Amino acid sequence: MNKIYDKVQKCYKQVKKMTDFKPQIALVLGSGLGDYAEKIKIETVIDYHEIKGFPVSTVQGHKGRFVLGYVEDIPVMIMEGRVHYYEGYSMSDVVLPIRLMKMMGAEILFLTNASGGIHRGFEAGDFMMITDQIASFVPSPLMGPNIEEFGERFPDMSHIYDEELQEVIRKSADHLQIDLKEGTYIQLPGPNFESPAEIRMCKAIGADAVGMSTACEAIAANHMGMKICGISCIANPAAGISKKPLTHEEVQQSADRAAPKFQKLVTECICRMGKSLKK
């Protein structure tokens, strides 16, 4: 058996002993959405530390637990604190939680994050729906022997972000009168913020926002046949767009200020997605 698949299986079996909850939607909380899980109808909470072999987030503001419960009547599995490649984990460990949530039953992966705005039309506090991504600067989570249990060797990436889910997000934002931006997200390895020259490069190849997560998670989910959507909170202008130095604290504070509106948008999206799953 493939070692990576074996590790995911072992984690899955441990979680199944703790709960028989079956989610429809897997939600990954980025900066600014940290306390969202506390506002749902909670069924079970599982700390990452309780799962032997599971990677644990070391980033300030990322709690490190799964919260399973209901948004309205839609069963969701929330990842409260993702792990990042820059923390020293292998890429297979970075996406292990995504694979686990799929094995738990999730059909949709809803990704959120805080990012730096590259597009000149973006301001701190804006929300960008991710319509495409660039992941060429971090290792693919699919490198190595293919895990046949998850998917095929060469998965298509033409429509990685589901168009029907994008329409759901548009309608949700319109209903809440939230100005929704759209664009391409690029993942760079981090943990250092990007240089102005790197941001100019990102802009030249078509990126609108930059961060240190998300794209690799989408690749793993796409490999397994999940429907994927994503919203990025623009926390700050990227390096060179503004002359102000970048700090993690500033990113966190900006994301926290946008949190109430972000949480309303996420809830509205999940409710609408849940209705579409029932059809």
Language-model-detected regions and their locations in the chain:
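Short acidic/polar active-site loop segments enriched in Thr and Asp
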Residues: 107-108, 208, 227
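Histidine/lysine/aspartate-rich catalytic loop segments that bind and position anionic ligands
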Residues: 134, 138, 142-191
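Zn-dependent metallopeptidase/amidohydrolase metal-coordination segment
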Residues: 212-250
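Non-catalytic positions within long, well-ordered alpha-helices that form the structural scaffold/packing
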Residues: 102-105, 203, 222
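His/Asp/Glu-rich mid-to-C-terminal helical/loop segments that flank catalytic regions of hydrolases
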Residues: 239-279
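Metabolite-binding pocket within alpha/beta catalytic cores that recognizes anionic/polar moieties
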Residues: 1-157
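Active-site/ligand-binding-proximal alpha/beta "capping" segment
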Residues: 166, 172-208, 266, 273-277
